[in-house]
Design a protein with these regions (language model features):
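"…centered on the first transmembrane helix and the immediately adjacent amphipathic helix/loop
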Residues: 1-83
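Alpha-helical transmembrane segments of integral membrane proteins
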Residues: 5-12, 102-106, 110, 133, ...
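Small-polar-interrupted transmembrane alpha-helices in polytopic inner-membrane proteins
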Residues: 15-20, 103-123
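Membrane-proximal cytoplasmic C-terminal regulatory module of class A 7TM GPCRs
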Residues: 37-42, 155-165
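Helix-boundary and loop/linker segments of multi-pass membrane transporters
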Residues: 56-60, 95-101
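Membrane-interfacial alpha-helical segments at the cytosolic side of multi-pass membrane proteins
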Residues: 78-93, 141-156
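Membrane-interfacial, low-structure loops and terminal tails that flank and connect transmembrane helices
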Residues: 93-99, 160-165
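Interfacial helix-loop-helix junctions of multi-pass membrane proteins
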Residues: 115-139
């Protein structure tokens, strides 16, 4: 079972990295359009009577919230990536598996390094460019993802009958 989980976490990590790469390959215009659609969806779900607003009022709200949606997406992508990398190490026979500091540090650093290379990649995409702020947000998300997996494992190990051998 542990081997299957390990393979699943590795595949999830690879899938997330590929997904992030493809999102970064979108031109500035394509990326902005996707962000606007996602923002519209969130606003229609969470803002009462959003659908009753005029198109102009809707676009104004979308413009106001789109920045935050983009930054939350950055945070979430890298939280998920770091979480899955942590899972890959946790379900393996890694020599530092029982060292919580290293188990947090290594996935966080791997995801942060990927965030840096992702920003370099955006230099070569029309209408996009690198952003130190995005790397910082990505890194914070990656740290959160690693901490989240660590906390979950601590909680699960305290559940009777779930202690590892």
């Amino acid at each position: 079972m542990k081997r299957i989980l390990n393979i699943l976490f590795i595949l999830l990590s690879m899938t997330l990295a590929i997904m992030i790469f493809f999102f970064s390959s979108d031109t500035g215009e394509e990326s902005g359009s996707k962000s606007s659609r996602v923002t519209r969806l969130f606003l229609s779900l969470f803002v009462e009577d959003f659908k009753n607003l005029s198109e102009e009022e809707q676009e104004l709200l979308i413009g106001e919230y789109s920045f935050f949606v983009r930054k939350i997406a950055h945070f979430s992508e890298y939280a998920a990536l770091s979480f899955s990398i942590y899972g890959s190490f946790y379900t393996s026979n890694s020599p530092f598996r029982n060292n919580r500091r290293k188990m947090i540090l290594i996935p966080w650093l791997m995801a942060t390094l990927y965030a840096m290379t992702d920003e370099i990649h955006q230099i070569f995409v029309a209408g996009r460019g690198p952003s130190v702020v995005d790397v910082m947000i990505d890194s914070l998300g990656a740290f959160f993802g690693a901490i989240a997996f660590c906390v979950i494992t601590i909680i699960l190990l305290k559940v009777p009958g779930k202690r590892e051998k």
